[in-house]
């Protein structure tokens, strides 16, 4: 199958904003995709090469890409760099460079999807001395044989800046439409395996029956079950039917642990493989988990010298560190607090009641200095739960989780079986959807960011304010570099940005406002932190903003 067919799909997807049309385009493409390509094409459609949980990365930045294009086309690097400044899109500039290429090689071959994918695998696996040169040559060979439009989308895939507007929901519906299977079965299979390639192949070859038989697999992370918010401990108890398991809500990074004999893999909340960054935790897990095979879930917390938890950003610093890890082990010690188990020695436990899963967890974990069970209180009494809540806050934790004793584990679902209880005017996690260029010495930097809450019903991101304070000069440099590849359009000083990044924002209060489509505006919003552990769809919802507004107004009325 030729790569030009995939490039044409990208072009058509880019031209429409209609989700129904995007779904149809993707479904039609999947129908004609050969079986042997069906496990890789869904990722390429998403603008990726590998699933998020796959450790492999291309490791190619703009500079190396420009060198490869220059080598392939004969267009000087400086000319390509100048073109990028004009177009604002390296993909467009690559297409222009290929158009300028004097002639094709006598041995030129049309690009196929298999060749492109196999080359990407070689690039990802190139390690050690001379690996950058090898990566550049592999890329140059692709660009030598690429047509301008193919080159544009190759470059965007390499840099992860596809801009076609296809996310997981569209791909899920397209798989269902293409192979005439139930969307809910596609969703279920994906939630259990986080692997669209595998799900697409099962859907085509085995249909609804095959999808319904999909099971948890060690080495493929399960989408985490999520919680809704509760206004108070009392409200949580009422919602739970009068009795609940309350657990400390740790201020850390949620992780999923897969153990298979001596092999342990740890995935972050966004399902990225973070195993290499936490070797001391891996060794502690091997000693603590008794079964041969298991999947458990917990919160990884950074511990300060006084034994109190440090902000979760410290854990993210550990995840990002690729070198001098031993130094970081000493600087930022970690502790894993386990709170759930989904799989033990061939048996899936997701249909098992929470109370029984917790009992199983206690049975299979040998606690140690680094591996502990999440502290828990099962009670019917509001006073007991409130005392536990106060204690959690005094210890420096975020609050409490409340869980129904009979709740099954529902991958990817944000329901009321689990509730989180935190102080009323908590910070919000919001998505950057726009920004403005600064003035004077900051004219080359983005300096004010339009942030939005997620509307799960429409899939839209609804703006709730502009955040311009709380950033250091270094933050603005980093944010500009990070966001530039995702600029969709510019109007004067304002740029629209593809929703990719979540930031934590504090504020004085929430106001009703006709200024924004959401109907709300944050008063005096201030940047707190980048939430690299959250995807845009995991940001706070517009319902949560409305809930906080109501709580705030009730609190004012009591004064």
UniProtKB/Swiss-Prot annotation:
* Listed name of the protein: DNA ligase
Temperature optimum or stability note: Still active at 100 degrees Celsius. Thermostable.
Q: Which family does it belong to?
A: Belongs to the ATP-dependent DNA ligase family.
Its UniProt entry gives the catalysed reaction(s) as:
ATP + (deoxyribonucleotide)n-3'-hydroxyl + 5'-phospho-(deoxyribonucleotide)m = (deoxyribonucleotide)n+m + AMP + diphosphate; NAD(+) + (deoxyribonucleotide)n-3'-hydroxyl + 5'-phospho-(deoxyribonucleotide)m = (deoxyribonucleotide)n+m + AMP + beta-nicotinamide D-nucleotide
As cofactor, the record names:
Mg(2+)
Summary of subunit composition and partner proteins: Monomer.
The source organism is Thermococcus kodakarensis (strain ATCC BAA-918 / JCM 12380 / KOD1) (Pyrococcus kodakaraensis (strain KOD1))
InterPro entries (alphabetical): ATP-dep_DNA_ligase (IPR050191), DNA_ligae_ATP-dep_bac/arc (IPR022865), DNA_ligase_ATP-dep (IPR000977), DNA_ligase_ATP-dep_C (IPR012309), DNA_ligase_ATP-dep_cent (IPR012310), DNA_ligase_ATP-dep_CS (IPR016059), DNA_ligase_ATP-dep_N (IPR012308), DNA_ligase_N_sf (IPR036599)
